[in-house]
Amino acid sequence: MSLIKKKNKDIRIIPLGGVGEIAKNMYIVEVDDEMFMLDAGLMFPEDEMLGIDIVIPDISYVLENKEKLKGIFLTHGHEHAIGAVSYVLEQLDAPVYGSKLTIALIKENMKARNIDKKVRYYTVNNDSIMRFKNVNISFFNTTHSIPDSLGVCIHTSYGAIVYTGEFKFDQSLHGHYAPDIKRMAEIGEEGVFVLISDSTEAEKPGYNTPENVIEHHMYDAFAKVRGRLIVSCYASNFIRIQQVLNIASKLNRKVSFLGRSLESSFNIARKMGYFDIPKDLLIPITEVDNYPKNEVIIIATGMQGEPVEALSQMAQHKHKIMNIEEGDSVFLAITASANMEVIIANTLNELVRAGAHIIPNNKKIHASSHGCMEELKMMINIMKPEYFIPVQGEFKMQIAHAKLAAEAGVAPEKIFLVEKGDVINYNGKDMILNEKVNSGNILIDGIGIGDVGNIVLRDRHLLAEDGIFIAVVTLDPKNRRIAAGPEIQSRGFVYVRESEDLLREAEEKVREIVEAGLQEKRIEWSEIKQNMRDQISKLLFESTKRRPMIIPVISEI
């Protein structure tokens, strides 16, 4: 059945996130005068983003054109896809489309952030068709590590614009995790104009190990454990959590969760029937010590680096609930991102030092939730797109995916490597990338949205690395003299007792600068402060090779 509704003219595709990074998915598709947002995800901060809680895409372009926005279409319930939805809805009105579980998780996010706003939610599935003025939109089931994942298909007169979301192919999975390859093939036969596809594992050869094989090998590994077993995984990896529950039941072990991030999403999914949990399998973490060590499994969960951080604290005996003991076994069911590799290596060393046995994480007992090379080529061959846009990955992953598309038969000149804010235009004849819109990161610090910029981050780095140096002086401007001070206060810069000579020298330098400023015909406070910053910075760098943040404080009587 053809879902083409009318003859279209102009198409624009704009990534606002999810390119050059593995997170923060957000893609804008405009067909004539209608705009559609595909996913609205967040990113957890990188190490250098000191004090930042989360990062979301800059949606200033969407806000400038909000009357055109017809809806937010979500592929699955991970934070990379839905984490920014509540922030978007604070700034504009738009209906939200997603699977039953995804919508439930969005509602929970809105509730957690105390956003009391009437939102139009539409629950969609593999059979849903949403009709708009210029296009029709349908969906197809995909496989990911969370149930009810979907791909989105925007039907235009030029063919379908297909957004895969995050996916892999696994014939061993059924029910809420099963892909609808038949529906994908139908879309491919109807004609795919543009394929926008997940690039996360585009550099990994072959296929993922099927999940039924993973569970079999996990069972064999866990069955050999004689003491307490701790499994570390992301709270969002529902497949892995279900597998641990299955194995625990077979081994007659109780299961307890360690980590707050799992509680809300797990409880929602459990109530909706997405988890199969044998009776009396779960116990509170506070009751673990009531059971023999060989009768429990602890699942340490969290978002991003939280599970690894928890293990590190446990290994150093700094965790407030549980610590690693001699004879514990630990399994990390985590795919290490580039910025996590060093942290994980250090944590493994800490665990071994604390007496833990590490169950090796290899292809037999762990699989990615993203398609590897052959799975990505399979999607391309099923869809047979005219144009191809690799997304959801670092730039090197996008390039690797572009090469796979060329191998699968897509003309190289019809493959677009895009960055945030790039605009791909199609006017009925040519597809060109010749425009850019505002894009970037919005940093969330506490309840502040976008009020932390690069200057603030620079200052935080300065404070973290070199400390702070405060010079306080009280002036009597009427009599042009120093009434009190200078007084020097330092934090995180030098140990005061061992640097008394340097601090006295700094006090004298401040006195010289201030007294010179007081002799001027017109006293310029800003100029005096800047001279203090410049000259004190030079003095301190010559003595210590460090540049603390210098704050001059001048008060008057």
UniProtKB/Swiss-Prot annotation:
Function: An RNase that has 5'-3' exonuclease and possibly endoonuclease activity. Involved in maturation of rRNA and in some organisms also mRNA maturation and/or decay.
Keyword RNA-binding: yes
GO terms for cellular component: cytoplasm
PANTHER family (alphabetical): RIBONUCLEASE J, RIBONUCLEASE J 2
Protein name: Ribonuclease J 2
Cofactor: how bound: Binds up to 2 Zn(2+) ions per subunit. It is not clear if Zn(2+) or Mg(2+) is physiologically important.
Matching SMART domains: Lactamase_B
Source superkingdom: Bacteria
Localization, UniProt: Cytoplasm
Annotated family: Belongs to the metallo-beta-lactamase superfamily. RNA-metabolizing metallo-beta-lactamase-like family. Bacterial RNase J subfamily.
Subunit structure: Homodimer, may be a subunit of the RNA degradosome.
Any Gene Ontology biological process: rRNA processing
Enzyme Commission no: 3.1.-.-
InterPro entries named in the record: Metallo-B-lactamas (IPR001279), RibonucZ/Hydroxyglut_hydro (IPR036866), RMMBL (IPR011108), RNase_J (IPR004613), RNase_J_2 (IPR042173), RNase_J_b_CASP (IPR055132), RNase_J_bac (IPR030854), RNase_J_C (IPR041636)
Broadest EC class assigned to this enzyme: hydrolase
The species this protein was found in: Staphylococcus aureus (strain MRSA252)
Cofactor: Zn(2+)
NCBIfam families: MG423
Residues the record lists as binding substrate: 366-370
CDD domains hit by this protein: RNaseJ_MBL-fold
Keyword tags: Cytoplasm, Endonuclease, Exonuclease, Hydrolase, Metal-binding, Nuclease, RNA-binding, rRNA processing, Zinc
